[in-house]
UniProtKB/Swiss-Prot annotation:
Organism name: Xanthomonas oryzae pv. oryzae (strain PXO99A)
Transmembrane region(s): 1-21
Record flagged with keyword Protease: no
A GO CC term assigned to this protein in UniProt: TAT protein transport complex
Keywords, ordered alphabetically: Cell inner membrane, Cell membrane, Membrane, Protein transport, Translocation, Transmembrane, Transmembrane helix, Transport
Protein name, UniProt field: Sec-independent protein translocase protein TatA
Gene name of the encoded protein: tatA
Function: Part of the twin-arginine translocation (Tat) system that transports large folded proteins containing a characteristic twin-arginine motif in their signal peptide across membranes. TatA could form the protein-conducting channel of the Tat system.
InterPro entries listed in its UniProt record: TatA/B/E, TatA/E
Region (Disordered): 41-75
Gene3D superfamilies reported for this sequence: 1.20.5.3310
Recorded topology in the membrane: Single-pass membrane protein
Molecular function terms, GO-annotated: protein transmembrane transporter activity
Subcellular location as annotated: Cell inner membrane
Length: 75
């Protein structure tokens, strides 16, 4: 008596679809999926050893080296 049957959940789903519309629910589901994907990617990147950083860190390091060379040339 205390639990919901499948028919209760279907009625709730129909009401939610009527209130919010499918376009809003679809975009909300996409946003949620993207957030979960980014979270998993971030967790996976944390597991990498310090010596194996991503491409972003390499480009930042290269930019720092290039700036240091320009500073040395300017002197």
């Amino acid at each position: 008596m205390g639990g919901f049957s499948i028919w209760h959940w279907l009625i709730v789903l129909v009401i939610v679809l009527l209130v919010f519309g499918t376009k809003r629910l679809t975009s909300g589901a996409k946003d949620l999926g993207s957030a979960v994907k980014e979270f998993k990617k971030g967790m996976h990147d944390d597991d990498k050893p310090a010596g194996k950083l991503g491409d972003d860190s390499r480009t930042a390091e290269q930019a720092r080296e290039a700036q240091a060379e320009r500073d040395r040339d300017a002197r």
